[in-house]
Amino acid sequence: MQIEPQATAFAKRYARGEAQVVWTSLVSDLETPVSAVLKVAGARPMSFLLESVEGGAVRGRYSIIGLDPDLVWRTVAGRAEINRGMRHQPDSFAPCNEAPLAALRALIAESRIELPDVLPPMAAGIFGYLGYDMVRLMEELPRPNPDPIGIPDAVLVRPTIVVVFDAVKDAITVVTPVRPQNSITADTAFARARERLSAIIDALDAPLAHSPPTLQAGPLTVWPSSNTTPAEYERMVSAAKEYIAAGDIFQVVLSQRFEAPFELPPFALYRALRRVNPAPFLYFLDFGGFSIVGSSPEILVRVREGTVTIRPLAGTRPRGATPNQDKALETELLADEKERAEHLMLLDLGRNDVGRVARTASVKVTDQFFIERFSQVMHIVSNVEGQLDGKYDALDALAAGFPAGTVSGAPKVRAMEIIDELEQEKRGLYAGSVGYFSAAGELDSCIVLRTALIKDGVMYVQAGAGIVADSNPKSEQQECVDKAKALFRAAEEAKRFASAARRGQ
């Protein structure tokens, strides 16, 4: 096993007190991200897998596995807390002295590492989610609604092992960050890093010992229930339309939460979801007491090399059964005045969000009103970019765009007040973000859509519809049901696979 950097170069940086990474690479043509997760993470909590599928068909270049964090940061009830001994005392969280966003900014700064050019930006950093209700730390909003699920408002982990799959080079790079400690010599730190890498390489080299999850006999169909009846949701839509008619808002996104039993391991749902609903942002995050499985189509905010990007998706049609039908649906979507007006409203909101942190006159709409195709649907998409002003950082950019207008409404703050009034329960994870702050302090995040939260044998899926002046309440109710279907279809697929394993097929 060849390790980079060499021990002497490592020791020099260590002596200067610089954080750095140690890494090794191997050929990956016989390994997949899924098999690697089963080998190296198994059932260990505080691990994750991030993947990507572009256009519903082409795998993205990088897939990322992270595990064994040295720290976990979270926000509970508006207060930040951190566990710096996660590997030895997983329940030992201490409150942070600063307000949550200030504490997070300090953690991002603390976690910066200068990576070599041969490694991608996500080879080290902090990874996780910020739930929708983190916006209460950014805007003045009423107290949240009741929270029957009870997960933290945010969780971010800093893995000591990151496994990077490069689909272009057919290579796996295993990376372990090292941060100098006064009580540990450079030789000892390097030896421990080598041991961590060796353990992962040994696990990857071993045959897959995983047995498919099995399911006890029972129905395979998943029948979800909602926290909102159809009649209640239709009344919510009618109330929102009254606010629109009164001039309070132009649009608001109203959601409901569906749930159904799910007794299989959460990773079984992820494996099914990546097959039935591939998307640009595929993610599996295991936090021990709960797991997150998602296939989001939409960027929230990206900050890369000084450029801030927001890509609003608004306006939807199903994919056609034939190329001609697909093209006809595209033409119909682009000609739909209601869809175009809604998209333009959210494009303007995205431009304003970027403008809050971008240099003067740098905000540009680089593409607008083009169609992006996914496995099941197509959307109208636009792309907004701006150059990050030097007085702001990636966290400022995230706060400027949080939550996305496509899951809240316009004007955003008034729309969120109406969401609090009309929705019955705290949103929690839904409409927040999943992503990472890289070792360079950059950001890649997506909106939490088409996502299941699995806790205590139950999967929760939240979906919403954008309400405008001419919305039909029954149609908006059906849109929520349709958007949630992909996750429950994946659950049925996972159950079918497990049932076949039980029968020995």
Features from the language model and the residues they span:
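Extended alpha-helical targeting/anchoring segments
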Residues: 1-505
